[in-house]
Amino acid sequence: MPERVWDRFLTEQDRSHLAMSARRRIGFGRKPALLLIDLYRWVFGDRPQPLLEAIKTWPGSCGLAAWQAISPIQTLLQAAREASIPIVHMTGLDHSGIEGWTAWREPPQPAAPSPEADDRRRRRWDIVDEVAPLPGEAVLRKSSPSAFWGTPLVGHLNYLGVDTIITCGESTSGCVRASVVDGCTYRYRMIVVDEGVFDRHEAAHAINLFDMNQKYADVVPLAEVLDYLAKWRAGQNQKPPS
């Protein structure tokens, strides 16, 4: 079995337990959608930098892990567009007078922030150009970790007949996990793209992928998702016109 990113964090007892209990895969369904979670400027900054350097100007940065995920996400996004499946981009809710869940943890803002700091805060929820939405792709804003809480996502997906949600974005241990758990609760088949999610903490990234894979989702390599989308697209093309 190929090594997984979480393997080096498992204890001997963990490994023994896994060997004794076979895990049944969730599998792909009949109608997929792609959910891109929080691919905004706040976690990328303006250029690739190591985490400890990047957070000096972009406190929410995920450092180089964010930039390393761009290419796989672009590949996934292109495949989803070619297959004509529903695509939903999630980002933060801002300029609304509503405090998000991070308000208590954020350091106090200076009474008169510098023009540069003010500009960064204005741009923080802007989805980065590399994976920007195209016209016709849904963009939803959220004020909580889950893509489902307080948003019309469920109604949108149900209307479209979606039963499978392919997920990428950040952070693995935060908004991705929260969205995956809620998606599972709503009885969607949740698929997490291994190379398409990232976190600022390596251990949190690995163990949350392990936990989601055990309980709520299938964590699968990009190649497997691309193969599924290609087959799904071919199947759609063979259907007689309605």
Identify the residue ranges that each predicted region occupies:
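A substrate-binding/cap region within the structured catalytic cores of diverse enzymes
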Residues: 102
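Short hydrophobic beta-strand that contains or immediately precedes a catalytic carboxylate
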Residues: 35-37
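A solvent-exposed, charged loop/short amphipathic helix patch at secondary-structure junctions
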Residues: 47-62
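A basic- and aromatic-enriched beta-loop-alpha substructure that forms the phosphate/nucleotide-
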Residues: 88-94
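Cytosolic catalytic domains that perform sulfur/thiol-centered chemistry
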Residues: 29, 59-66
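A short, N-terminal amphipathic alpha-helix
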Residues: 67-86
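Active-site-adjacent betaalpha module
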Residues: 1-33, 42-51, 78-83, 95-98, ...
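Short, conserved micro-motifs enriched in small and acidic residues
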Residues: 63, 67-70, 173-174
